Every structure is written in C-alpha cells, then in structure tokens.
C-alpha cells in the first residue's frame, strides 16, 4: 500500500475513550509505538497512522474525509452532526458499529431544592451544558422555552456558582451530581463509543484493510461477551444439561475413555453462566465444570 493510501484512524488524545480505543486496536493485532509528545503514531506492523486529537474534532475529520476511521462517543458525534447540518457542512459518516465501552447518558439535572415535576418545570430557566444542540432539539420537541449557558467543562458546578438553574450533562454513575447537590431528572440521550468511517470512496486495498480491522473488532467484542464452557455430563440428562447452557450454539459432545455413561461437553456461551445455573447443572449430574474467558473469536 502506498504512503498516500495508509489507513488514517482518529482517536481521542487523552480521556475516557483513549485508553479503551488503544486497548481494542492492540487486541486486534495493531501495534503502535505511542509518543505522548506527538499527535501522530505509525503502526509497526500495518499501513495505519493514528491521529490523537480532541474528541470533538474527530467527527469533523471523518466527515471531511481527512481521516478514514474514528473512535468517538455517540454523544459527541450527534452534537457535531446537528451543528454541521445547521451550517450546511458535510455531516454524513458511516457508523460501522457500537463498541462495548464509553457508555453514558446525557441528562437534565437540577439542584436538590428545585421543585421539579416534569420537563415543563424547566420553562424559562437557564440550563448550563456542553451539548447545546442535543439539548435544543430535545426542548423544542417538548415545546419548552429556556435560556442556555454554554460551558466547555465543569458543568455540574454551574448552579452553585450562580451561572444556571439546571444543567444538561453526561452522567455515568450519578456520583458527581450527588456531590454537587444535584439530582437527575430526564435522560435525553443514551450514548456509547462507536466506530465511524468516512463516506469518501476508498481504494480497494484500503477498504480491504478497513474490513479486516472491523472483522477483528467484531471478534474481540464477541469474545469478551462469550465464555468457553467444559463439563462432564451423564448421558441420561444430556438434553436437559444442554438446554441449560445460556445462549450456547450446538455444543461439541465427546465420549469419555472407559465411561460409556458420561460424555464431555464443550460449548461457547454468549451469555453469563451464573452460579445458580452451575448449581442446576450439578444437580443434573454434571461435574468438572469449567467456565473460561475467550480472548479472540472469528467465524
């Protein structure tokens, strides 16, 4: 692949998505030598360049075709798409898949002493947020007029600082809200990390590399959601035992040496095998039950 056809991937330079994005790429076999002082890193084993930038720059870089792929939170992507649509700028991209990290929600929250009944209680109040476009769309859908206070960070302190009456901010556990005397009232947007691709037409070799990376990501995510189960089972309760294995494909059943009344079962389960399920398996005569994580899956 020529230098101009190297795959360019944008990730957050630092923050909650940066570590997980790099970890995922590493799990896919992509090796980078990251220098914290440099914004561009070159893969050691694939024709891939990594651009480490501010998260709110990533959607625009993808939509403008500057980079080919981007790891981004859906909340940032949605906010930027609304902004670009209002300015008649390119706002299209291909969402290849959601990822299993970066889950959060964009919520309205008010001080503990606020007399909140429903969303209409926010009529005419000042709301601090870093997501004015998503907030505006939600409030317009509800038919509620309000005043906004745009902040780039520390939104949760705005009411105590006298800057706003309420806030619209990202929430993960709610602990930050509680620490600042606030409580969550409405969830207006659910978000997780996702992988997006530019709509720019790609050369065949670059698109093949994108497909390879996506296939590996699918395998890594699927493996994390799956477990490999091994156990010994009596032949007389085999059907009942197989039925108990959660989300399992057709298991492999193997004979045991010198024991015609028992078999070995190997299965991949796409759901958690809880303790109560293992206890039920034991009651049906299963033994030597092993539940192991899977590092990679394909096919």
Swiss-Prot record:
SUPFAM superfamilies: GlnB-like (SSF54913), Periplasmic binding protein-like II (SSF53850). Pfam families: HisG (PF01634), HisG_C (PF08029). It catalyses: 1-(5-phospho-beta-D-ribosyl)-ATP + diphosphate = 5-phospho-alpha-D-ribose 1-diphosphate + ATP. The keyword Nucleotidyltransferase does not apply. Its cofactor is Mg(2+). It comes from the Bacteria. CDD domains: PBP2_HisGL2 (cd13592). One of its GO terms (biological process) is L-histidine biosynthetic process. Feedback inhibited by histidine. Its EC number is 2.4.2.17. Gene3D superfamilies: 3.30.70.120, Periplasmic binding protein-like II. GO terms for molecular function: ATP binding; ATP phosphoribosyltransferase activity; magnesium ion binding. Keywords: Amino-acid biosynthesis, ATP-binding, Cytoplasm, Glycosyltransferase, Histidine biosynthesis, Magnesium, Metal-binding, Nucleotide-binding, Transferase. Pathway: Amino-acid biosynthesis; L-histidine biosynthesis; L-histidine from 5-phospho-alpha-D-ribose 1-diphosphate: step 1/9. GO terms for cellular component: cytoplasm. InterPro entries: ATP-PRT_HisG_long, ATP_PRibTrfase_cat, ATP_PRibTrfase_CS, ATP_PRibTrfase_HisG, HisG_C, N-reg_PII-like_a/b, N-reg_PII/ATP_PRibTrfase_C. It is an enzyme of class 2 (transferase). It is found in: Cytoplasm. NCBIfam families: hisG, HisG_C-term. Belongs to the ATP phosphoribosyltransferase family. Long subfamily. PANTHER family: ATP PHOSPHORIBOSYLTRANSFERASE, ATP PHOSPHORIBOSYLTRANSFERASE ATP-PRTASE. Catalyzes the condensation of ATP and 5-phosphoribose 1-diphosphate to form N'-(5'-phosphoribosyl)-ATP (PR-ATP). Has a crucial role in the pathway because the rate of histidine biosynthesis seems to be controlled primarily by regulation of HisG enzymatic activity. This is ATP phosphoribosyltransferase. It comes from Shewanella piezotolerans (strain WP3 / JCM 13877). The lineage of its organism: Bacteria, Pseudomonadati, Pseudomonadota, Gammaproteobacteria, Alteromonadales.
